[in-house]
Amino acid sequence: EQVMQYGEDDLTFVSRLLSEVGIWFRFATDARLKIEVVEFYDDQSGYERGLTLPLRHPSGLFDGETEAVWGLNTAYSVVEKSVTTRDYNYRTATAEMMTEQHDATGGDNTTYGEAYHYADNFLQKGDKEAAESGAFYARIRHERYLNEQAILQGQSTSSLLMPGLEIRVQGDDAPAVFRKGVLITGVTASAARDRSYELTFTAIPYSERYGYRPALIPRPVMAGTLPARVTSTVKNDIYAHIDKDGRYRVNLDFDRDTWKPGYESLWVRQSRPYAGDTYGLHLPLLAGTEVSIAFEEGNPDRPYIAGVKHDSAH
């Protein structure tokens, strides 16, 4: 119904929205403009490539002046074989909204089971290429599961390691997955008087079939209701601004921004005691009336008018 920020700072809010659609970002320096920029990617085109390091453990403070990696570890988990999503859209209430099982592995027989997710906030079933459709979310979710299938770790003296970098490790003793190429997803740097500079990194196997997906940041859970007032496009209007589907626009009390009158929110549905295709009960609300806004499954993006209240002004 809308996109709402509540109880979260700006970075968390933006990161949450990006994580839901599988977009990751990084900070970089624009060499031409000489300014810091933020780059957003959702596929392998954003990876940095071309770094190959040998497998070699440094000796104390002496690393032979050669950047290398060591202490390589791999951890494997069985993840879901496919993902199915489903949602409900009252605008097309009879439309089939459950997607087919999506398998992004291309036939990997080490995966098992099906993950079923409801209410991913999509309006149509669509296909895997249709942005923010049911099939799109099924694909993104399965790729996120596959990112957890193999978690790789290691240490390095290379200052070039950073998230989004693909590296290969040379050496017959290196695990095959590192020799084929891995994508760095996180780094931690450390140094001390009695130790040389080193990085601890985490990575996932590089894949052309699917890319890195950031961990899903959970939405805030809206407990109870929030107060709001029904609005209109006309000042001192006798009736509120209402559309053909009986929806209203409301001004949420916590919102500090100033909006054009009658456009403080997107259209919000109203819960009624009686409704049908050719019958129902609708008592029109007046501009300024206090209403209680509830949220489907506590989702801040799915508000509806749950009730109307008297107050000192109305």
Regions found by a protein language model. Name each.
Residues 1-314:
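Amphipathic alpha-helical and helix-coil boundary elements used as assembly
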